[in-house]
């Protein structure tokens, strides 16, 4: 019974994204910050970023993983983050990749605590195994007044990721639903908004 509901929910979201693809090009986005984020960081229209291709080859990243790693790299650079925390099965690889891109950033992988100054959190596939239950609440509820970006993967595949996504969406200033990933931005200076993109 739940499997059928989950499949129908997934298909409904795919159709919704196909209909609302306009945000991918920046159409209908009225916030200048979000317009620039979508075009210059998420899409990289100007091809202004370089990537550590030696690490991509060494780690044997497939096309989808390479897109994910590059997206995270562009986000951390565009948002000028100082502290990154990653949870998930592939978190060590992502941590190494981001460290190569941002040598000055403090990067923590599958840690048991959340540094108070963290401004970028990545919850990857299988983050449930590494994320203590008390930290799950702290990630969303401590973000209140702080400038923070949270990226959650598999928001329509994993029950726990979907629950976190829905809870975070209610509290976040801006949420970007990218079908495979959800990006939550907490920043009181930003204009509130919800966007649907597929890259």
What do the PLM-derived regions correspond to, one by one?
Residues 1-146, 156-199:
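A short alpha-helical cap/connector motif
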Residues 149-151:
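Structural detector of well-ordered beta-strand residues that form the stable sheet scaffold
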